[in-house]
Amino acid sequence: MATLDVNPQRYQQQLAEKVQRLTDMFAPYQAPELEVFESPEQHYRMRAEFRVWHEGEEMYYIMFNQETREKYRVDQFPAASRLINDLMPLLIDAMKDNESLRRKLFQVDFLSTLSGEILVSLLYHRQLDDAWIENAKALKQRLNDEGFDLNLIGRARKMKIVLDRDYVVEKLDVNGKPYVYQQVENSFTQPNGKVAEKMLEWAVDCTQESQGDLLELYCGNGNFSLALAQNFERVLATELAKPSVESAQYNIAANKIENVQIIRMSAEEFTEAMEGKREFRRLKDNGIDLKSYNCNTIFVDPPRSGMDVDTCKMVQGYERILYISCNPETLKENLDILSETHHITRFALFDQFPYTHHMEAGVMLERKA
């Protein structure tokens, strides 16, 4: 992780700059007034990764200055959740005098939740042996006894040792209703828990009066699918990454939601299936008949690269498009195509990444009359 100047006194100023930037960027599309969703000013990041530096008997976390690439010591990290900050010094103290746990340890990754769970991954430049497992079990027990709801993972080349789980279970509150989400180590999750809740509430609000079914591309662990299911008869969601699909299935069952179906496909493959260019066995094997769906609304949350031209053209076939973007530059490129047929009816900024130039945006589009 790189330098981050977390300064609550600067929070409103940096937010105002983003509001101005996003408003100016989307002025050509006659977007309505921007809805702005703030982040907590500190302790907002549910994840953090640190390199580990060894100096004689000493051992501590470091980060790198993005401009100079110089390393600097980090004992606390105000961007990260309070849970991560509480654990950081205790973890280092517990490991620094233990040869088995400290030897060739080069990185520590933390994944925490609003629900109070935390997962710690210890990364090594050596193979892990039985002595490491014994010591790691004792470390886990010690931290559990100190009140941390914690699991541990040891990683080395081609090696992963899990004590006792490689995931956390997050609870997000959407308009007073709790949703539980399995979040697996090393797979994508929304980094800012409080803003993630606001994004879900906004998406639910945008689709309130919906008819028929919802199609969702790039659904990840089902983050949006589950909350949006209440507004639609059925939800058909696609995702390519296998661990995310498995988490999505877990989350559907855990939340007892019966009208969501996940299929493992890329957006590009799904476009081909929709257009009848190719038949896919996995649709048949899962008993999915695309023709039986009546999708007037499509939800997309693509990677930073946005959607390719063919996917944009397929998406244009839907009455309403809900688009969440972690990169407004590629959203703008996609809107050059989408705005030929649709106009923006809702426009939002979610401050997922305070004190950085990154912005998360949301637009609701409806077909022009």
Swiss-Prot record:
Pfam families per record: tRNA_U5-meth_tr
E.C. designation(s): 2.1.1.-, 2.1.1.35
Record-level GO BP terms: tRNA methylation
One GO cellular component, as annotated: cytosol
Catalytic activity, reaction form: uridine(54) in tRNA + S-adenosyl-L-methionine = 5-methyluridine(54) in tRNA + S-adenosyl-L-homocysteine + H(+); uridine(341) in tmRNA + S-adenosyl-L-methionine = 5-methyluridine(341) in tmRNA + S-adenosyl-L-homocysteine + H(+)
Signal peptide bounds: none
Binding site for S-adenosyl-L-methionine: 190, 218, 223, 239, 301
Enzyme class of the recorded protein, top EC level: transferase
Keyword tags: Methyltransferase, S-adenosyl-L-methionine, Transferase, tRNA processing
GO MF annotation list: rRNA binding; tRNA (uracil(54)-C5)-methyltransferase activity, S-adenosyl methionine-dependent; tRNA binding
InterPro entries: MeTrfase_TrmA_AS, MeTrfase_TrmA_CS, SAM-dependent_MTases_sf, TrmA_MeTrfase, U5_MeTrfase_fam
Active site: 326 (nucleophile), 360 (proton acceptor)
Function: Dual-specificity methyltransferase that catalyzes the formation of 5-methyluridine at position 54 (m5U54) in all tRNAs, and that of position 341 (m5U341) in tmRNA (transfer-mRNA).
Family in the record: Belongs to the class I-like SAM-binding methyltransferase superfamily. RNA M5U methyltransferase family. TrmA subfamily.
Protein name stated in the entry: tRNA/tmRNA (uracil-C(5))-methyltransferase
